[in-house]
Each structure stands twice: as C-alpha cells, then as structure tokens.
Amino acid sequence: MSLFSNHTLFIIIITVVVSLLAWQSPQLMQRLIFYPPAVQRGQVDRFVTYGFIHADGMHLFFNMFTLYSFGQAVQGLFMSKLGSLGFVLFYLAALVVAIMPTYLKQKNNPRYSSLGASGAVSAVIFSYILMNPWSTLLLFVIPVPAIVFAVAYVAYSVWADGQGRGSINHSAHLVGGIFGMLATIAIEPGIVAH
C-alpha cells in the first residue's frame, strides 16, 4: 500500500508537518486555529484547519497514535463504500461536525479558540467500536471490551463537558464519536445487527 493509498498515514503525516510548522510560526498557528470571530468574518476553512494543529507534542502524539491504531480498519470500510477518498471525506466531515456545537456556543466569544484532531479521532474510534464492539481495547494497560470503553468514554465526556472547566473540548469528543457511529451506520446499515 503506497503512502497515497494509505489515507490514515497520509493524514497523520500532513498533521505532523502542519503542527510542526505552526509551532515555529505563531502567525500560522493563529491563522489555522478555530477562532469563532474569524469564522464569522468568512474564514470558514477554520472548521477544518484547526484539526491539523496541536497544542504540543503530547497532544499530537496521542491523537496521531490513536488515529493510526484505529484508522486502518475504518479506512477500509469507508473506502469500500464511498470510493478511494471515502475515509478522507469521513475524517474531514468529522472535523466540521465535531466543532459545530462549540461554534454555536462560542460564536460571540472573542476569547475562545480550539485546536486538535480529537473530535475526528473520536469519530474514527467510535466507527471502529461499532464495527468491532467486542474487541479488546487497552485502557491504561487494562483490557476492556470496546463497548464498555464506549459507554465509559461517553459518560466521562458528558460529565467533563458539564463541568465546563479546563482546556479540553469534551463536546467535540462526544459529537465526533456520535458522528462516527452515525456515519458508519449510514454507509453500512447492517452493522447495527451485530
């Protein structure tokens, strides 16, 4: 499989390169970050670009490691159902959908910004879980059935989002996960039966 046909790896490489460049250029970081007032001024590309920059190396590593871990299986499904760019379209749509509730909530807040691929990565994780609900995931080295992880992840995201503290966009994680499941069901309705 070449780099250009392995869309998961291609997205990871682009994200790493763009993040590294943005860390070196505050102007680039500010141009790509999700900033609602800029969106209102017509910079709608920020609904996507925010997902290609990360706050620091740990943020980038965790998201890209997770994307790599689950992306291959999900990529296969979306490419088989939607064609060669199916996974890329799914991933980009997940970025947009995951940030939309945040935009609606924060659109008049000039102090708000968001970055990172977590919402789209959550979409990939939840698509995988829907495809393989009884597979075993390692949660801090503890083996957990994927379906149990999903329930715990949703519960935590709802609780953490309700707390409203910190710099993590839990709403994007939750909405991304829901989008991942709905998109998977839309292209493979029979998946619900298993």
Residue ranges and their predicted role:
Residues 1-194:
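A detector for small-residue-rich transmembrane helices and their helix-helix packing motifs
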